[in-house]
Amino acid sequence: MIQKNWQELIKPNKVEFSKHDNPNISSVIVEPLERGFGLTLGNALRRVLLSSLRGAAITAVQIDGVLHEFSSIPGVREDVTDIILNIKEIALRMREEGPKRIVVCKEGPGVLRAGDISTVGDMEILNPDHVICTLDEDAEIRMEFIVNTGKGYVPSDRNCIDDARIGLIPVDSLYSPIRKVSYKVENTREGQVLDYDKLTLTVETNGAVNGEDALAFAARILQDQLALFINFKEPEKPTVEESNSELAFNPALLKKVDELELSVRSANCLKNDNIVYIGDLIQKTESEMLRTPNFGRKSLNEIKEVLACMGLHLGMEVPTWPPENIDDLAKRYEDQY
């Protein structure tokens, strides 16, 4: 059946987020993944994170008394070119769509920082200590900024405004809230299989969004883009009611115990005790299992943990087990578990 193409691939059962000393850096560990999927997912998520998340940035600046970026300002130590470079590093968060205008005024002596800018609405300066310029005694500066929302990197020549007033200087804009993304793929173990992938993604942002949300947005973008390629309807699964009308027990009991990926010792003990199906296993009590030759407490805990993941436990009663046509039923319901 076609759904086996994706249903029988192993899916991650562990997603762990970890924080760093820098609150803008976070990591996520995902495991286990099918071999090769760590590289596939890591590279796709990295590219989307760096290119496609929206943010806010300054697109143009007007400095009183300045006509172009190759000017200098009396009493200001930095020239306009250096000031513009510093302006490009201002990190902003703005939930509403732009453009918006913000203003800053400063008298010397002193340092003009990003936190001195008067914001409007829901706008927030994320690096208020960032230095824009340094003013000497009796120096004064007034700047007006245009802030907009977008994605990716936009060069200054694309931020030019038609019929803009003289002195409005366009600025390169880095809208992306993501500063850096790296990933690492390692081998991990699932049951007796040792060559699954473990993906570790590390995301550094400017503070406008946390790493966990950024990953969620990137995954949603990929999901939306890939949906175009799905040219079929999801095959219908038999409902629980339909299954129960034909079976007097959970279809998962028809699964063979050698598919549970138990340790070699546990699997051999079950085999030696003629336990073939999960339905055979769950009717055993803990004391009965411990009386099995070479079967110890460690194997018991392993089996209890596996059964718990399936919503089952030892010592269950199934009056209609085993069914007469158990082999035929096992083949019929194999896609449901």
From Swiss-Prot:
Enzyme Commission number(s) from the entry: 2.7.7.6
Pfam family, one: RNA_pol_A_bac
One GO CC term, this protein: cytoplasm
Keywords from the UniProt entry: DNA-directed RNA polymerase, Nucleotidyltransferase, Transcription, Transferase
Top-level enzyme category: transferase
Catalytic activity line of the entry: RNA(n) + a ribonucleoside 5'-triphosphate = RNA(n+1) + diphosphate
One GO biological process term: DNA-templated transcription
Stored CDD domains: RNAP_alpha_NTD
GO MF entry, a single one: DNA binding
Region Alpha C-terminal domain (alpha-CTD), residue ranges: 249-337
Region annotation Alpha N-terminal domain (alpha-NTD): where it falls in the sequence: 1-233
Domains as described in the record: The N-terminal domain is essential for RNAP assembly and basal transcription, whereas the C-terminal domain is involved in interaction with transcriptional regulators and with upstream promoter elements.
Subunit structure: Homodimer. The RNAP catalytic core consists of 2 alpha, 1 beta, 1 beta' and 1 omega subunit. When a sigma factor is associated with the core the holoenzyme is formed, which can initiate transcription.
Similarity-based family: Belongs to the RNA polymerase alpha chain family.
NCBIfam families per the UniProt record, alphabetical: PRK05182.1-2, PRK05182.2-5, rpoA
Function summary: DNA-dependent RNA polymerase catalyzes the transcription of DNA into RNA using the four ribonucleoside triphosphates as substrates.
Xref: HAMAP family: RNApol_bact_RpoA (MF_00059)
Name assigned to this protein: DNA-directed RNA polymerase subunit alpha
Source organism (scientific name): Bartonella henselae (strain ATCC 49882 / DSM 28221 / CCUG 30454 / Houston 1) (Rochalimaea henselae)
Taxonomic classification: Bacteria, Pseudomonadati, Pseudomonadota, Alphaproteobacteria, Hyphomicrobiales
Designated gene of the protein: rpoA
